[in-house]
Amino acid sequence: MKSVDAASLPAFLERRPLVVDVRSPVLFRQGSLEGALNIPTADIQQKKHQLPKDRPILLVCERGIQSELAGLYLEADGYAEVYNLAGGLNALKR
């Protein structure tokens, strides 16, 4: 899995990745990246999603830990272009 840091995020978003926020719906409603989908980590683990395998996927959470775990599940399921926002959404607030 590859990482994207806060400084390179704007350029990475120009590639039009599918942005997936893996936090709970309650936290997601408090704010996320524009255009993000909310698919909690447990749903990714249990394959309760229909994420495309032919598009880059950027996973985000609060600190980058939960999204990294979700990325490992996706990679184990055959997803090749999985990216994690290093430091999570908190890194964007610094």
Task: Enumerate the language-model features and the residues they cover.
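Rhodanese-like catalytic fold shared by cysteine-dependent sulfurtransferases
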Residues: 1-18, 24-56, 63-94
